[in-house]
Amino acid sequence: MMAKVSKRMKEISAKINAEKKYPVSEAFDLLREVSSVKFVESVDVSVALGVDPRKSDQVVRGASVLPNGTGKTVRVAVFAKGPAADAAKEAGAEVVGMEDLADEVKKGNMDFDVVIASPDSMRVVGQLGQILGPKGLMPNPKIGTVTMDVAKAVRDAKAGQVRYRVDKAGIIHTTIGKVNFTSDALKQNLEQLLTDLKKAKPAVSKGIYLKKVSVSSTMGPGINVDFSDLNI
């Protein structure tokens, strides 16, 4: 098994020049070329930003609605009541509730990928921080998951919204689709993400902001992308 893996890695290394910045479409073609697993891999992106994440005013976080989605089915839970709860259900939320939903979360019943909350439900949701927080599910107004318009938030989540937060090294990691997407679809998704990241640039960030962009498949190596010709 190890021999097979190392042989595959040698073949991949021969095809990808780690020092080169590849045109976007060529990078996506390469991803498909080196993908040899039996499932449809996600296309992940890492963006190195010119920020110091140790400083609170340089923590970049937010959300981006990708025009071509992520290729994933997203299950949404919403904390809301009254008309807001009805609107969330109509928008396609799988689970909607208040104290009853909180009880399910406390029991560990969390068959959902995104949690959205109306502002008046935060008294209930606030008690679940230690459960939802470590799983990256805690609603937050900065990424649009605490909102008066829960229906729009549900639709955005279903349409392929990705959330991001800069890590300690100043890098954003997220997904922009699947390897079976067309190169144009992946390019449009990447352009949307980078456009939204530029809008989220902290005022105190100096010098080059978008420093490096690389793409990879789930099991594949990173490929550096020349993003200078993108529409961002």
From Swiss-Prot:
PROSITE patterns, per database record: RIBOSOMAL_L1 (PS01199)
Keywords from the UniProt entry: Repressor, Ribonucleoprotein, Ribosomal protein, RNA-binding, rRNA-binding, Translation regulation, tRNA-binding
InterPro entries: Ribosom_uL1_bac-type, Ribosomal_uL1, Ribosomal_uL1-like, Ribosomal_uL1/biogenesis, Ribosomal_uL1_3-a/b-sand, Ribosomal_uL1_CS
GO cellular component: cytosolic large ribosomal subunit
Domain of life: Bacteria
Keyword tRNA-binding set for record: yes
Membrane-spanning intervals of the chain: none
Family stated for the protein in its record: Belongs to the universal ribosomal protein uL1 family.
Oligomeric form and interacting partners: Part of the 50S ribosomal subunit.
PANTHER family: 54S RIBOSOMAL PROTEIN L1, MITOCHONDRIAL, LARGE RIBOSOMAL SUBUNIT PROTEIN UL1M
Protein name per Swiss-Prot or TrEMBL: Large ribosomal subunit protein uL1
Organism of derivation: Francisella tularensis subsp. holarctica (strain LVS)
Gene this chain is encoded by: rplA
